[in-house]
Amino acid sequence: MKTLRKTLALILSLVLALSVTGVCASAQDGGLKISVASDIHLSKVEKIDDRFKNGEYGNRGSLLSLSNEAFAVFDSFMQDSAAAGAKYIFLAGDLSNSGTAEQHSMISAYLEAFENETGIKVFVVPGNHDYYGLKTEPVETFRTLYKNFGFSDAYAVDEKTNSYAADLDGGYTLLAIDAIKPGNNDGEIGAELLSWIEAQAKAATARGRKLIGMMHHPVVAHFSMQEKMINDSLVKNWKTLATKFADLGIQYVFTGHKHSADIGKITSDAANVTFDIGVPSLLNYPLAYRFVSFLDNKVEVREKNVTSIKNPLLLPDGYNEEALLKVTTNTQEYAEEVFDFSLRDMFNRFMNADRLCKLIGKDDEGIKKVFETVCEKAKYLVDLPLYGEGETIETIAKKYNLTLPASSYKTGFELLSAIFKVYCAGDENFSSNSVEMQLGLRCIAILLNYSLEGTSSDTKVLFLKAMTAAFGGDIAGTSVALTAIVLKYGDDFGIEVVSAFLKPIMEDVLVDSAPGDRNVDLPAYYEIREGNEITKTLTFFEKITLFFLKIWNYIKGIFSAVKK
């Protein structure tokens, strides 16, 4: 019965897709249109977790995602892409959650039926999850299962990886790059694969083709401390690879893995540019994907969202009527609720002394004891009311001569959730003057005072040094400056201390740099620049100047706090 139900759901889904087939053919005016999704993490879920019946969400809390509803959300994305006139659909890795042959066969069967009915070609690359369950000959097995989704259209395939090159309409060529090492979450392009990429890129440009790249791991950092703060979030040796891509003419690369919408840019010494268009997870709030139009005079990048479930029969069993109505018709609100539920679970697991010590690479009992206290207090404070009398953050703040800026946020968790959602959605702009940054810095100052009250100056210095190590090690002079700050303020972590230490880091992550992340027009393709000594020298000095400005602003902020 269950198999029949799922088969019926698939048929109905494709019947709906047929209704948009005519749209696809007529919507190709206005350049090459490509719809791109990533990190779909599809798995077979027959029945939702029993916890749902108690008002909770039976989802994997660590992923902040609609894991139970994955297939239904994915189907809605495919239908929406067809209706919008996509010529091609790109899937940038982590198609499956566990990487089993069963999951891949299910996905492949759906894609086969979709292609046959709509005529829209689908191209895939593997992500780290896609090799998890393929224990025997994973590269070959993946290629066999997805042979019709890129490989059969390719004119060149790297046999040692699942990288391939395929010509698209409009004079474009796709370089699909498999930088995954099976059994490893890291992304890496070795010497042999890089040589293959270089050969394909040069051959394609010699034919007058314009290159579009796709791989799972980002190839450009989206903020300066990303490599240190988020383990395996970038392909190894990303900076060297990204500038190489730029000089090869790979001007646009679609990537996933980070589960957030970002567009990064890198410029080579020869003044060539690569844009890394980060594709968010389709299952995380706000259920977003990229819809990109490659035009003669520009590249239009637009964010689109799944707002409803097109085929409820693709959902698992177990919802009550109210929940089913929300899932299908108000999918965004449902996704936001799941996000909040999952974020709380993630926060509680992250606030663990052993985990934090491992994160910063410090196996030190002194640091561990400090972390234990901070984690315990953080879990308590995050749910206290921010404002009012009684046991509130505002009342505790007065004890340390701190005041909270007025805001509409009710708790620290509500603030944390709001910041995290905007970060995942893209175009984050929490500057130092924003109420979110001001309130967040004060909440952190309160946490540190509340947690480390009565501890010695040495303990405070130890804690701050540990935090410095977490963000890439000591910057010149910071150890001396941190000691001076703690000695000056004694038992109080004033807002000046926290601002001087954390504000540059938080702004680096939470203030988006150009170009925008969500809806932006990017430059059209241009001839590859060979570069000369003048352009190389200017680019070098520009990079050096920016680097030293960041260090100077950081140190200046710390010493200015000491002088106050």
Language-model regions, residue ranges each:
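Active-site-proximal beta-strand elements of phosphoester/diester hydrolases
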Residues: G31-V45, G171-K181, M214, T274-P280, ...
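His/acidic metal-ligating clusters that form di-metal
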Residues: A82-Y88, T173-L175, N184-F275, Y380-Y387
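N-terminal active-site segment of His-dependent metallophosphoesterases
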Residues: A27-A101
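Extended active-site neighborhood of metal-dependent phosphoesterases/phosphodiesterases
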Residues: A101, S105-W196, K202, A270-F275, ...
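Non-catalytic terminal accessory segments
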Residues: T3, S26-G30, L315-K564
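Bacterial N-terminal signal peptides that target proteins for export
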Residues: M1-I11
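Active-site glycine-centered loops adjacent to acidic/histidine catalytic or metal-binding residues
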Residues: D39, G93-D94, G127-N128, H216, ...
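Hydrophobic core
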Residues: L12-L16, V20
